[in-house]
């Protein structure tokens, strides 16, 4: 049995889960809230629309206006209540990256736990999605040796495509990125 929420680590897991829910995950939407509305944002938005369309067909006009819709999406704007806008996007990402390193600590898994928990499975997909599905050319999270090693350890407990996106839309292999 592999419990995702072992009760003997309940306090530690709850503390890190609060960080994930109220800081880490909302930060992923920062660029859609107040990032530059430039060619890269539009390209990334259209790729996201294509990924959604592969699972649930969308009319062309919805895919076309996707970049504008992201800026106005209620769930994204609701997330903004948890974001510290006093930091630049770059500084916020650096701060969260350092906090992620602290939460992994000496590992092998988040919270310095011996087995992966819901914490690892909540953060892992966020770090690999962009690379696996063509939103970024390199697995940027794997540039740091601690994160790369953690990603490799977590990936051993997951299928080849651990994400909720169509296999046919996957453009990069996680295994390949982690073996370099």
State where each predicted segment sits.
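GST-like domain detector, emphasizing the conserved glutathione-binding G-site
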Residues: 1-60
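GST superfamily/GST-like fold recognition
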Residues: 113-132
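A mid-sequence, solvent-exposed acidic-amphipathic segment
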Residues: 68-111
């Amino acid at each position: 049995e592999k419990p995702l929420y072992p009760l003997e680590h309940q306090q530690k897991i709850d503390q890190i889960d609060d960080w994930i829910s109220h800081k880490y995950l909302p930060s992923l939407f920062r660029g859609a809230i107040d990032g530059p509305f430039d060619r890269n944002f539009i390209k990334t938005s259209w790729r996201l629309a294509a990924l959604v369309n592969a699972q649930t067909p969308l009319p062309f006009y919805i895919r076309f206006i996707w970049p504008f819709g992201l800026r106005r999406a209620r769930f994204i704007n609701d997330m903004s209540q948890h974001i510290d806008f006093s930091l630049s996007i770059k500084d916020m990402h650096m701060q969260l990256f350092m906090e992620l390193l602290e939460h992994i600590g000496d590992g092998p898994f988040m919270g310095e736990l011996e087995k992966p928990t819901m914490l690892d499975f909540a953060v892992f997909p966020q770090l690999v999605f962009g690379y696996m599905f063509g939103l970024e050319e390199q697995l940027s999270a794997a540039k740091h040796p601690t994160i790369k090693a953690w990603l490799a350890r977590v990936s051993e407990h997951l299928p080849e495509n651990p994400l909720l996106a169509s296999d046919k839309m996957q453009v990069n292999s996680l295994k390949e990125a982690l073996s370099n």
